[in-house]
Amino acid sequence: MANVEIRVIGNDTYRVEGTVEESEKKLSDAARSGQSRLAWFKELASGEPVGINPAHVVSLRTV
């Protein structure tokens, strides 16, 4: 499976499981659901869930 790096405002990055397309869909779905809705991913480094606010995402890229 591909991995994606999500960069957010403040230059923090999260490496998560999935493809760019899957990540973009999760972020898009969360953005359409409301302002306080987070997109949930599994972080590669820790294996823990991480919630990301779609309004804070700067870029996505495959790693």
Tell where the protein language model's regions lie, with residue ranges:
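Eukaryotic intrinsically disordered, low-complexity regulatory linkers and tails enriched in Ser/Thr/Pro
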Residues: 1-63
